[in-house]
């Protein structure tokens, strides 16, 4: 009984102190509140108080890191161009990211590094002491979550007061935030240079820390391949696609979970379904444009269902195509990861007739292009590797 009460208190604390905005520096936090006219719901008042204090701490630590590490990071040469995992939300980008960083020649930015980009070089040793704030599983599915798991780098811009579409999560009932920063095409030259410098500096920091090939996973980068190539001309790209009939309800569920947990308002979800439909179409339009700019030897594509069905075979082909080194050196770690996660089950969704018609009408081209059966559901388990 005592353990149950303790667990309940811990769950309430995690809800009370949801960690997404905990890494904002003072200017980031103030800009977010002012831009949205301090429209914080009364049930979220504690966020405004807690994060105002923490944001000042983050700003001080950021200045300290710049003094201690700024010069050394700036002088760091990124010897290995980064690898970008692109694709729509809920298509398996996180799974692929985790599979690839199992290889000890690769690394990905951790949750702590993405939420504290301005001072993680100084304070990452402290991350285990605040791990209790984080749920052990993601809000939208059953995948493991912690501050040391790889995370999306989009939060790097949010935490430093720079524009990002992800700021919509904080105020979901307000107009969408910074949509022009999805593809960056309408961003003024000065702001675009700031965006590029932020990306380059963050990759420098991660590379400085571990001296390994940095793998970044960020669905919004699917819109930005042209700009990514301007920053890293030799970058490699991996695109993963998944059954659109699964992606549609799963993406809606993702947004609802993020808005409920990390929003500073009580979300109404007005227009959410339509937004998911249109964003998907726009993403694949920009992804198709971007891939034309990449040398085919540096762009690889796979289906989530094929990865789940034969992870070892799919990753072996990926390694060969992109020239990622000796696959056999990676194989023991890969097999261990697969064995450890063999019981993982994905969420299942039942589409209404109306929802299926929406997917058919708007996403039919992607369904046909990637050979998806309009009636057959995907497998739900990650199959462990067998034999050689």
Swiss-Prot record:
The keyword Transferase applies. It holds the Pfam family Sulfotransfer_3. Keywords: Transferase. SUPFAM superfamilies: P-loop containing nucleoside triphosphate hydrolases. One of its GO terms (biological process) is sulfolipid biosynthetic process. Coiled coil: none annotated. It catalyses: omega-hydroxy-beta-dihydromenaquinone-9 + 3'-phosphoadenylyl sulfate = omega-sulfo-beta-dihydromenaquinone-9 + adenosine 3',5'-bisphosphate + H(+). One of its GO terms (molecular function) is sulfotransferase activity. Belongs to the Stf3 family. Involved in the biosynthesis of sulfomenaquinone (SMK, initially named S881 on the basis of its mass), which is localized in the outer envelope of M.tuberculosis and negatively regulates its virulence. Catalyzes the transfer of a sulfonate group from 3'-phosphoadenosine-5'-phosphosulfate (PAPS) to omega-hydroxy-beta-dihydromenaquinone-9, generating omega-sulfo-beta-dihydromenaquinone-9 (sulfomenaquinone). This is Omega-hydroxy-beta-dihydromenaquinone-9 sulfotransferase Stf3. It comes from Mycobacterium tuberculosis (strain ATCC 25618 / H37Rv). The gene is stf3.
